[in-house]
């Protein structure tokens, strides 16, 4: 969950709502106008919508099947206060949204893989499209929802997904990444922009 109050604006933007009661209390304690952007439809990102008050809600058509409310974002929206909302292709979930503001792009879970009982996988086509979208983002910092290192350099994150894409096999629509992880969920081979080892959950 992220709160953004652009300078000179009377609106607080909130990216995702989480599920715990404390998060709902924090949202309801915000004074003034509140706009909420939901990254995707998974329960850990939307459940508090039932408990909070807001002025506007932005979702994709897939997410609206679950929220039953909100303005559908098809493509991208740019607001006078500098907030930008857009869709991003994702293997993790259909209908993913990201939020950009100044030097930061909040990607939610969009970069994460698809989880099955026996495999962690990326769809090759969606991964290619996701990387292209990430390359087009002008913000130098990416923020990934569940990572220990919430804020990471754009190029550092891109290197990881380019490595994953390079593992694709001819004729296969998916890339298995089971062996790309440490036991704690961190990526085995990743470095930040300074060459330091970092752990990134996919």
Residue ranges and their predicted role:
Residues 201-202:
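Eukaryotic N-terminal low-complexity, Ser/Thr- and Lys/Arg-rich leader segments
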Residues 15-17, 39, 59-60, 106-109, ...:
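Active-site flanking residues adjacent to catalytic metal/cofactor-binding acidic residues
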Residues 20-22, 41-48, 64-67, 93-95, ...:
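Active-site environment of divalent metal-dependent phosphoester hydrolases
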Residues 128-198:
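Divalent-metal (often Zn2+) His-rich catalytic cores of metallo-beta-lactamase-fold enzymes
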Residues 55-56, 124, 160-161:
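Short, hinge-like loop/turn segments at secondary-structure boundaries
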Residues 21-63, 138-141:
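Active-site metal-binding motif and surrounding structural segment of the metallo-beta-lactamase
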């Amino acid at each position: 969950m992220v709160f953004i109050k652009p300078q000179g604006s009377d609106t607080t933007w909130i990216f995702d709502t989480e599920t715990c009661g404390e998060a709902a209390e924090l949202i309801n304690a915000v004074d003034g106008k509140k706009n909420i952007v939901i990254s995707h439809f998974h329960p850990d990102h939307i459940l508090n919508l039932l408990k909070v008050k807001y002025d506007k809600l932005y979702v994709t058509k897939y997410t609206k099947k679950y929220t039953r409310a909100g303005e559908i974002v098809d493509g991208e929206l740019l607001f006078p206060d500098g907030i930008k909302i857009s869709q991003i292709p994702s293997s993790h979930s259909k209908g993913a949204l990201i939020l950009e503001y100044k030097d930061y792009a909040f990607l939610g879970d969009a970069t994460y893989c698809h989880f099955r009982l026996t495999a962690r996988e990326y769809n090759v086509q969606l991964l290619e499209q996701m990387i292209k979208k990430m390359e087009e983002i002008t913000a130098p910092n990416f923020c990934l929802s569940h990572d220990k290192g919430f804020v990471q350099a754009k190029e550092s994150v891109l290197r990881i997904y380019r490595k994953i894409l390079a593992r694709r096999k001819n004729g296969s629509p998916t890339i298995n990444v089971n062996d790309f992880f440490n036991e704690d969920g961190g990526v085995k081979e990743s470095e930040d922009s300074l060459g330091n080892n970092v752990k990134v959950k996919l």
